[in-house]
Amino acid sequence: DPNADFTAQFRLTGLLPGTQYDVRVEYGASRKRGHKTLDGTFRTAPAADDAKPVTFTVTTGQRYPNRDSDRGFLIYVQMLKLDPDFFVHTGDILYYDQLGKTPALANWHWQRTYSLETLVEFHRNVASYFMKDDHETLQDDAWPTMETEFMGDMTFADGLRIFLDQVPMGDKTYRTVRWGKDLQVWLVEGRDYRSANTMEDGPDKTIWGAEQMAWFKRTVQESDASFRILISPTPVVGPDRVNKRDNHSNAAFAHEGNLLREFIASQDNMVVVCGDRHWQYVSVDQTHGVREYSSGPATDRHAGGWSNDKRMPEHQYLNVIGGFLAVTVERDDGLPVLIARHYGVDGNILNEDRIAAE
């Protein structure tokens, strides 16, 4: 589609659960001239009554100038070695702030990032879900009614449209997916429906919007998965820097944040995975007991904004470093367990956290 940066999307239907599929994409001016092929593979989710082990990986903070390999980003090489069932990018996939001042330049950011060898090789072999945050929507801490001259000709509406052009998506940018008997994940939208960060906090201030919040609570309560995981572009638990006012762990959104943490705490075997923060952590909310895993940024060069000696009561693990998070849900002596492992960019395990289903 020339109006969508020459991207093409099509829906696959009738796929069987728990099945490995091979894909061949053919492209070129014609079959006789410039014809090329690209092969890939992916696995579909197991059926809801299948207790098959599932592993997925997560990252955030993928800024092009901070890549750590001539071929792109090292984490994609290491994640591929784990042969994950699926991958989630929680947002900050790329950064419009400095160089994406027009829609054409924003599209160019997608083109150059997803032409990197490590990303092409990884995504040819792993099913992926993409979420957006502020930097691939417009700029740092963006909201729909933000007025800014900083981004030139680029607008919030442009960011929403370009994101949907560049990544595969269903009917909404918030959705839930069941991966077998023991896992269901919720991927939420944190930019489209939010109030201005500068608005006074209270019952009317929101990040998710009323419709998404109602959907989230309803679908979580309907789920009988052994483990339920909220995957959020931004923190729900934190802790975060005191001057931040963009997420549910900040005082600026304390009302909705408290309601969300209270709801999650009322659910058995539910945890949070988040992106956005430039450091890895495992934290437990001191009021409600909600557990949160921050994936940390894609590279060591991107890590920062906190220090390893600033350990708070919430922290079970803290490391200002790049890498990724891998989550496995499997059975141990017939009982469901969740294992969350933080990795460095070199593929070394930095921390392991294990939870048995209650």
What are these model-derived regions, one by one?
Residues 1-358:
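Metal-dependent phosphoester/phosphodiester hydrolase catalytic core
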